[in-house]
């Protein structure tokens, strides 16, 4: 089987939406029966985004096999059925780390190690490895054409197109076509200059995706085609839309998938986008709305919680309600009190690290428990719920996590001292160990209690969810907390670790150690988020009586 590659680049400015465009195109090709995957190549020198600030980089998306990756991989999984893995995302730092390790071992037999060919060859090898077994692979190059750090990746894909043959390689370039109100027209010159920059590197784009706040007129697309040496039918207008799930239909309506299939000589049926049409219909025709408060510490950048926000929206689709998300800084809860949590239909505390704002999260969990407000805690959101219950119900004054107070009297949450690395080897860590790559990561099995709410929601006794954490419930103190009324609703496959807790005699109080947001999709939703949004809707109705 021959694998075909579409290399996706961006020009003029960043944040044009390369990831959404690539994912949308992949969704159309998948709907034509093709086996599709997507890769993201990031030009920063960090080995992975695992230790990067969420406020700078956005969320870290965790794959089934435990890779800490760029948030664009979350978009990919929400748009196509193919599961991402560590092969789908790598960085400059990872490439240099691999090459330097080989150099130290003597693998290069004394050769002078250079960007070309050693770095570019390493990039090409990873791209080819990631594409094995697929009909079409979309490869998104992070950053903007012209950035110095992107040059090795651009050179690598230029070479790769020659290596595999131009009949199996396409270059798709996203570019900004701004509208100038003073002139009353869109301007194509930035696109021309962006393509000129690509040509100077040796890459002639085959497809141009024109990003604008409005549809780019046919005469302007013809002008772009003429000056950029691209067929008119390969100049695609991608205007702003009110829902990203409309983009597959927008691209298909302009024949982008037909053009690609003809270029690759792929004989496949027309794309059936009925599932996406259903998503768009549900999104546009809600029967009501709810307001859910999300209390976190990185709220100045909503992308830090991208998958959670999307999963809440998916939960809304499954309940035919619009979910309005109110982002609340947990430090504001500390300084202004729980009064700012009033008038919410439900409360969610997502994952996070560090002590800043944690007491505000603990106060939030108490407010939700005592006032019968639906609560969903994720990762740290479960740990603060446990701490709150231990302090205020189980009589364990000043209970805490050793992450925040190492010598506390009741360490109800403690460090995981053993975990398996990406090769399956058991590693031992302590508080002084490196932060990068030293967490419980990836898909883990969980056994659900028969009498639990989550057992009803999932409709199964065993589930698999993705993890990203260093701290866990301390089993040594668990019996006292359970005796006070807390229910352990889910345990790890070996029954050693607490994965889910519930508060009985509460309308809906569920907290999990894993990250359910990573497996939620617009077409299928997720049982926890669907149940949570339903509980929010029911709470709203109770309050209205």
From Swiss-Prot:
Q: Which residues carry out catalysis?
A: 379 (nucleophile), 515, 517
Q: Which reaction does it catalyse?
A: UTP + L-glutamine + ATP + H2O = CTP + L-glutamate + ADP + phosphate + 2 H(+); L-glutamine + H2O = L-glutamate + NH4(+); UTP + NH4(+) + ATP = CTP + ADP + phosphate + 2 H(+)
The pathway that the record names for this protein is: Pyrimidine metabolism; CTP biosynthesis via de novo pathway; CTP from UDP: step 2/2
Which residues are listed for Mg(2+) binding in this entry?
A: 72, 140
Similarity comment: Belongs to the CTP synthase family.
Q: What else is known?
A: CTPSs have evolved a hybrid strategy for distinguishing between UTP and CTP. The overlapping regions of the product feedback inhibitory and substrate sites recognize a common feature in both compounds, the triphosphate moiety. To differentiate isosteric substrate and product pyrimidine rings, an additional pocket far from the expected kinase/ligase catalytic site, specifically recognizes the cytosine and ribose portions of the product inhibitor.
The UniProt annotation places UTP binding at: 14, 187-192, 223
InterPro entries named in the record: Class_I_gatase-like (IPR029062), CTP_synthase (IPR004468), CTP_synthase_N (IPR017456), GATASE (IPR017926), GATase1_CTP_Synthase (IPR033828), P-loop_NTPase (IPR027417)
Q: State where ATP binds.
A: 15-20, 72, 239-241
CDD domains recorded? CTPS_N, GATase1_CTP_Synthase
Q: What Enzyme Commission number(s) appear in the record? A: 6.3.4.2
Keywords attached to this Swiss-Prot or TrEMBL record, sorted alphabetically, are: ATP-binding, Glutamine amidotransferase, Ligase, Magnesium, Metal-binding, Nucleotide-binding, Pyrimidine biosynthesis
Which residues take part in binding CTP? 14, 147-149, 187-192, 223
Entry's Gene Ontology cellular component terms: cytosol
MF-aspect GO terms: ATP binding; CTP synthase activity; glutaminase activity; identical protein binding; metal ion binding
Example GO biological process term?
'de novo' CTP biosynthetic process
**Quaternary structure, from the entry:** Homotetramer.
Protein name listed in UniProt: CTP synthase
């Amino acid at each position: 089987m021959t694998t075909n590659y579409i290399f996706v680049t961006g020009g003029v400015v960043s944040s044009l939406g390369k990831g959404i465009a690539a994912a949308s195109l992949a969704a159309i090709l998948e709907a034509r029966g093709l086996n599709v995957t997507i890769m993201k190549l990031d030009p920063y020198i960090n080995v992975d985004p695992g230790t990067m600030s969420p406020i700078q980089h956005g969320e870290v998306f965790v794959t089934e096999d435990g890779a800490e990756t760029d948030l664009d991989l979350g978009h990919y999984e929400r748009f196509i059925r193919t599961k991402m893995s560590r092969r789908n995302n790598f960085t400059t730092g990872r490439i240099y780390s691999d090459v330097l390790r080989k150099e130290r071992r003597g693998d290069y037999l004394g050769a002078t190690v250079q960007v070309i060919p050693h770095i570019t060859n390493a990039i090409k090898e990873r791209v080819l490895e990631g594409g094995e077994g697929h009909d079409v692979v979309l490869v998104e190059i992070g950053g903007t054409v012209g950035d110095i750090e992107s040059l090795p990746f651009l050179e690598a894909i230029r070479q790769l197109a020659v290596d595999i043959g131009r009949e199996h390689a396409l270059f798709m370039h996203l570019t900004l076509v701004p509208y100038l109100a003073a002139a009353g027209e869109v301007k194509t010159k930035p696109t021309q200059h962006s393509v000129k920059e690509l040509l100077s590197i040796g890459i002639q784009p085959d497809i141009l995706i024109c990003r604008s706040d409005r549809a780019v007129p046919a005469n302007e697309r013809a002008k772009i085609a003429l000056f950029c040496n691209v067929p008119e039918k390969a100049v695609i207008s991608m205007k702003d839309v009110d829902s990203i799930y409309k983009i597959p239909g927008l691209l298909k309506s302009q024949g982008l998938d037909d053009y690609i299939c003809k270029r690759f000589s792929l004989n496949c049926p027309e794309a059936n986008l009925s599932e996406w049409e259903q998503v768009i219909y549900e999104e546009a025709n809600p029967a009501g709305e709810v307001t859910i408060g999300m209390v976190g510490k990185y709220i100045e950048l909503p992308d830090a919680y991208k998958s959670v926000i999307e999963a809440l929206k998916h939960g809304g689709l499954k309940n035919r309600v619009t979910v309005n998300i109110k982002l609340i800084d947990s430090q504001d809860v500390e300084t202004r009190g729980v009064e700012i949590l009033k008038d919410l239909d439900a409360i969610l505390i997502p994952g996070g690290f560090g002590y800043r704002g944690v007491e505000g999260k603990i106060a939030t969990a108490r407010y939700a428990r005592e006032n019968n407000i639906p609560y969903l805690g994720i990762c740290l959101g479960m740990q603060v719920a446990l701490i709150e219950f231990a302090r205020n119900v189980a009589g364990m004054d000043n209970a805490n996590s050793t992450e925040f107070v190492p010598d506390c009297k009741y360490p109800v949450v403690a460090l995981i001292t053993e975990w398996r690395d990406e090769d399956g080897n058991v590693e031992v860590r302590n508080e002084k160990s490196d932060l990068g790559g030293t967490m419980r990561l990836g898909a883990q099995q969980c056994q659900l209690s028969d009498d639990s709410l989550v057992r009803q929601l999932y409709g199964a006794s065993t589930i698999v969810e993705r993890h990203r954490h260093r701290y866990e419930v301390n089993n040594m103190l668990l019996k006292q907390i359970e005796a006070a009324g807390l229910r352990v609703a889910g345990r790890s496959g070996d029954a050693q670790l607490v994965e889910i807790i519930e508060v009985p005699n509460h309308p809906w109080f569920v907290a999990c150690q894993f990250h359910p947001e990573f497996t939620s999709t617009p077409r299928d939703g997720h049982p926890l988020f669907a149940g949570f949004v339903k509980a929010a809707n029911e709470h709203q109705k109770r309050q209205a009586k």
